[in-house]
Amino acid sequence: MSDNTMRVKVIAPDRVFYEGDVTFMEFNTIEGIIGIYPRHIPTTVVIAPGVLKISESQGDKTAALHSGFAEILGDSVTILAESVEWPDEIDIR
């Protein structure tokens, strides 16, 4: 992990959904959208349903993120989500 990345782990009840080094991420909280870069001020937030955006050196990823909370530290973010899905996993029926 370099100074330009942070370690992110997204955990759902049934699996570790995502784990990797990211340059930026964004998601909804109960107070609005939060964008997080490496060395963000430490905080804990409550997640509101919406889109999770993850920027890696290889490109961007998006997922549907539902209720949960996030612990944001200077070099890492841990999300505990009630539910989270990649676009191809969403059952629209």
Regions found by a protein language model. Give the residues of each.
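Short, charged, intrinsically disordered terminal tails
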Residues: M1-T5
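Compact, glycine-rich, soluble single-domain proteins
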Residues: R7-R93
